[in-house]
């Protein structure tokens, strides 16, 4: 692990309740979807007073955190550790744990989660209610929905 850290190969690694999860860097197709998603989210997020970012540390400390592919943040967000976010997005890669992160995101009061699956060409928009996520057609935070996003994404 020290060698991974020194080489910078641990940028996407996460710690789940003290358990280290090694996550490889994204593929070209993943990176392409991520860049396009950031561009598509920028205007509706800005219009709603939210800031768009790429990967960030969601959690309180190095002992339990996740690194989503990106997110939307309210004014005042910043620093190394984000206790919450308005929205996080995950891009599904083979063998990843995007869906398993939902309970963690719920515990950290992330309002919405967007899970984009390039293989299936789908975008699942989820909203937090009563401690769990449910699929919704449109975001409650920004003027965008899963159908429109799916249509506009430049799929690999």
Q: Model regions: which residues?
A:
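Gly/Pro/Ser/Thr-rich low-complexity, intrinsically disordered segments predominantly at protein N-termini
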Residues: 1-156
């Amino acid at each position: 692990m020290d060698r991974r850290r020194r080489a910078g190969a641990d940028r996407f690694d996460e710690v789940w309740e003290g358990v280290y999860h090694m996550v490889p860097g994204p593929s070209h197709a993943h990176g392409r979807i991520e860049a396009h998603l950031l561009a598509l989210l920028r205007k509706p997020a800005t219009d709603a007073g939210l800031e768009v970012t790429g990967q960030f540390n969601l959690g309180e400390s190095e002992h339990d955190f996740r690194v989503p592919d990106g997110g939307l943040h309210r004014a005042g967000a910043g620093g190394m550790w984000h206790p919450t976010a308005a929205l996080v997005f995950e891009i599904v890669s083979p063998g990843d744990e995007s869906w398993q992160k939902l309970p963690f995101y719920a515990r950290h009061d992330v309002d919405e989660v967007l899970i984009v699956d390039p293989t299936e060409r789908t975008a699942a928009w989820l909203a937090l209610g009563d401690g769990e996520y449910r699929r919704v057609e449109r975001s409650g935070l920004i003027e965008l929905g899963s159908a429109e996003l799916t249509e506009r994404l430049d799929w690999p």
